[in-house]
């Protein structure tokens, strides 16, 4: 699949180079006579455009994106929260958690379990007391790069 993608990239570059060559034959004729070309420039350009068109149609690769994440409900849509993947805004629903304790949970993860979370999160005594109220709601699933990258800033801004 990568070979096909590389071929497509090469063919696309060749198409761009052809776009900047003179469109009509004989616009800048030299003063002396040249030997007749075996294949005319126009025919070569037409052949190249057909090859590129066929390559684009036949070689279009499907995206390998992860479409469905099984635990998406735990990112804020369910009672339980996946601590390793949830965005900081999810903790706004939990009184006293946002922004201080939630920020520390998101910054110092990922965690294996509750014990690991309390050891790594660097919570103050007050924050730890607040977080303990919600222990039953926390899950510790495997971190997914698609969600960990947005733990602190999901890029959604209000006007």
UniProtKB/Swiss-Prot annotation:
Membrane topology: Peripheral membrane protein
The keyword Membrane is assigned to this record: yes
Assigned protein family: Belongs to the PsbU family.
Cysteine disulfide links: none
Protein name according to UniProt: Photosystem II extrinsic protein U, chloroplastic
Transit peptide among keywords: yes
Primary location recorded for the protein, binned into one broad class: plastid
SUPFAM superfamilies: PsbU/PolX domain-like
Gene: psbU
Record text on subunit structure and interactions: PSII is composed of 1 copy each of membrane proteins PsbA, PsbB, PsbC, PsbD, PsbE, PsbF, PsbH, PsbI, PsbJ, PsbK, PsbL, PsbM, PsbT, PsbX, PsbY, PsbZ, Psb30/Ycf12, at least 3 peripheral proteins of the oxygen-evolving complex and a large number of cofactors. It forms dimeric complexes. Part of the oxygen-evolving complex of photosystem II.
Functional summary from the UniProt entry: One of the extrinsic, lumenal subunits of photosystem II (PSII). PSII is a light-driven water plastoquinone oxidoreductase, using light energy to abstract electrons from H(2)O, generating a proton gradient subsequently used for ATP formation. The extrinsic proteins stabilize the structure of photosystem II oxygen-evolving complex (OEC), the ion environment of oxygen evolution and protect the OEC against heat-induced inactivation.
Signal peptide: none
Compartments (UniProt record): Plastid, Chloroplast thylakoid membrane
GO biological process: one example: photosystem II stabilization
Keywords assigned: Chloroplast, Electron transport, Membrane, Photosynthesis, Photosystem II, Plastid, Thylakoid, Transit peptide, Transport
Gene Ontology cellular-component annotations: chloroplast thylakoid membrane; extrinsic component of membrane; photosystem II
């Amino acid at each position: 699949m990568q070979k096909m993608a590389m071929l497509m990239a090469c063919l696309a570059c060749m198409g761009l180079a052809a776009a900047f060559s003179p469109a009509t034959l004989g616009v800048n004729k030299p003063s002396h006579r040249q030997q007749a070309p075996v294949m005319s420039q126009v025919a070569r350009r037409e052949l190249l455009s057909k090859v590129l068109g066929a390559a684009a149609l036949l070689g279009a690769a499907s995206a390998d994106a992860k479409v469905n994440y099984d635990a998406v409900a735990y990112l804020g849509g369910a009672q339980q929260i996946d601590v390793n993947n949830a965005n900081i805004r999810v903790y706004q629903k939990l009184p006293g958690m946002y922004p201080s304790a939630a920020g520390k949970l998101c910054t110092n993860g990922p965690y294996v379990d509750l014990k690991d979370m309390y050891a790594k999160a660097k919570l103050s005594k007050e924050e730890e007391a607040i977080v303990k109220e919600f222990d039953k709601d926390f899950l510790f699933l495997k971190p997914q790069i698609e969600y960990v990258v947005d733990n602190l800033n999901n890029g959604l801004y209000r006007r």
